[in-house]
Amino acid sequence: MLVVGRIGKPHGIRGEVTVEVRTDEPETRFAPGSVLRTEPGANVPAHPGAYRVPGELTVEAARWHQGRVLLVTFEGVLDRNVAEALRGTLVGVDRADVAPPTDPEEFHDHQLVGLAVVTSAGERLGEIARIDHAPAADLLVLRRPGRRDVLIPFVQAIVPEIDLAGGRVVVDPPGGLLDL
């Protein structure tokens, strides 16, 4: 599954939820009628009578609130209690349904996660754990064995080369970036 969002808190009393968007194509992924898979085992209820998150959710409606928060209504989610039960659920699409980028300088998150990170001098630093999408620039989360994770801005000046075939990302970090 390719994660395209994480369901956040309910908005109002009619089942609408906030969604933390994790895709560059929210208008396509969250279009009315879109069927999204849910993370297996998401939000296992504490008692038998609790709402169980289904394996798929169908988007009924989606809209931007104040230009920055995506509000989504899913079919069958009719009140705040059910919306609250969805909180924290990851939603996504099958990787097979995602076309590869047409621009050679563009990558999907799942293509980068797990790649080795090396300096331009060839020193292995660790691997990419995930990509965080920040307002100014995307951030590569560098996981280093036995050390804290480091956020590396995904910009040409710091990440000059992505070698998917070779399974590596070459970085040229400015002084002190890896010490934070």
UniProtKB/Swiss-Prot annotation:
Q: Which UniProt keywords apply?
A: Chaperone, Cytoplasm, Ribosome biogenesis, rRNA processing
* Record-level GO BP terms: ribosomal small subunit biogenesis; rRNA processing
Q: What is its main location?
A: cytoplasm
- InterPro entries reported for this sequence: PRC_barrel-like_sf, PRC_RimM, RimM, RimM_N, RimM_N_sf, Transl_B-barrel_sf
Gene3D superfamilies (alphabetical): PRC-barrel domain, RimM
Under SUPFAM superfamilies, the record lists: PRC-barrel domain, Translation proteins
Question: Does the keyword Endoplasmic reticulum feature in the UniProt annotation?
Answer: no
A single MF term (Gene Ontology): ribosome binding
Q: Which Pfam families does this UniProt record tie to the protein?
A: PRC_RimM, RimM
Its localization reads: Cytoplasm
Q: Which GO terms describe its cellular component?
A: cytoplasm; ribosome
Where's the PRC barrel domain?
Answer: 104-177
Q: Which domain of life is it from?
A: Bacteria
Known partners and oligomeric status: Binds ribosomal protein uS19.
So what does this one do? An accessory protein needed during the final step in the assembly of 30S ribosomal subunit, possibly for assembly of the head region. Essential for efficient processing of 16S rRNA. May be needed both before and after RbfA during the maturation of 16S rRNA. It has affinity for free ribosomal 30S subunits but not for 70S ribosomes.
Q: What is known of its domains?
A: The PRC barrel domain binds ribosomal protein uS19.
> Which protein family is it in?
Belongs to the RimM family.
Q: What is this protein called?
A: Ribosome maturation factor RimM
Q: Which organism is it from?
A: Salinispora tropica (strain ATCC BAA-916 / DSM 44818 / JCM 13857 / NBRC 105044 / CNB-440)
